[in-house]
Amino acid sequence: PFLTEMKKIHDEAESDVRWHNHEFEPPTITWNIGINDHTKAVNITPPQSICTVYFRPMPGQDGNILLERSRQAAEQNGLEFTVPVNGDPIYTDPNCDFVEEVLQIAGKEKATTVSYGTDGAKLTALKKLIVCGPGSIAQAHTHDEWIALDQLEKGAGLYTRLIKHWCC
């Protein structure tokens, strides 16, 4: 029953517009379900399985509603429920002066809104917060994550210009 509820939440997040934000692509929250039995063979029935859900809420939404539904489903089924990491989504208006200033320094015309989590969620107390950097997100967070050296050099150049602009 717990996994059924996790699947219901996943499907609701995909189909219910109250969980969508069209500034992002894709416009849906992330509710990524994983199950680990810690077995090495498919014909072994383990004494315990672990269900993990990677949840990335969208700005302006109360993700605690879904966390509480999950907690209640776990309690109803006698399961342990923990939230090891929790952070608010990062959002800075792409038309604000700070973003415009970064765009000018970066030599770019337009900011884009991205739909992935970062460690920046731990820095949301900062008043001016954006995520920027080199490379392609398509190369990141894969089993063979990598970045081209020319992209790394471009990133170092951008960070140098930003530091010189605000710190020197």
Spell out what each predicted region is.
Residues P1-C168:
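Metal-dependent amide/peptide-bond hydrolase catalytic core
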